[in-house]
Amino acid sequence: MQDVPNILAEFAARPWMAVPEADLGPAAQVPTMLTPEERLFYHWLGRRVQGTGATVDLGAYAGGSAARLLSGLALSGRDFHVHSYDRFRSSRAFWARFMPDEPLPKADDADLLPLVRRHLAPWRQHVTLHVGDIGEKRWTGGPIEILSVDAAKGAALADHIADQFFPALVPGRSILVQQDYLMSVQPWLCAQMVRLRDCFLPLAHVPKVGLAFLSVAPLTKAALTAAAVGNLTDGKLMSRVREAAAWHDGMVPRAVFKAMLEQIKAHPGVRLGWQMRQARG
């Protein structure tokens, strides 16, 4: 097992940037919302697993993140399995934007499952699709080595994800990726994580808005309760965002957190990202 200084140095070197895209194989062709760097990062992250536990992908959309994780895992030399969670539904607008080569469905809330199954077919024996509202899902699958979160679009759902999935992380081994961590319209993510700073160590900012963390201590119920964000007042939410700015000083520009504070001020009481974005409109 690597010690923490070695893991910090490993991520600081950003070795995923040296991964040739050809190494991703068929995963490189799967439609995705990921940035080019995120695509390489997920593949590299899968490839570096130690066999400590499952890989969990929260917020899969058309399978882009799962495919890149799977392409890396397949090269790891370890047994592997990805649990991918989503409603697996899409609006026509998102479909047209991210899958322009696919026939446009006639209505919104279109079924993505046939496409996802096709996209992940090369690894079909190594992936389980969990269909439905993540807010109603429970994790009972044992230790998690990689937890990718692209689903905490509201404060209440962020709390649910933490309660259900964070306790399965293995200190010293497990990597948590908060893919939307620095989005100005999701300030509850940094507000939650800063109160869990005794349990997580920031490893790397993966542009545009992702942050990777190392689990360094077990997640207790008391810690999760203290970190909860669903019922925070605007004032307390802003206070935690300021704490997070100090925590991430040197890794993330202060302007990122200033933008979050401006969103909270502009949209009092709003705790859903799409509502902030819509109101900002």
Residue locations for each model-derived region?
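S-adenosylmethionine/decaboxylated-SAM
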Residues: 8-11, 25-28, 47-281
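Class I SAM-dependent methyltransferase Rossmann-like catalytic core
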Residues: 1-52
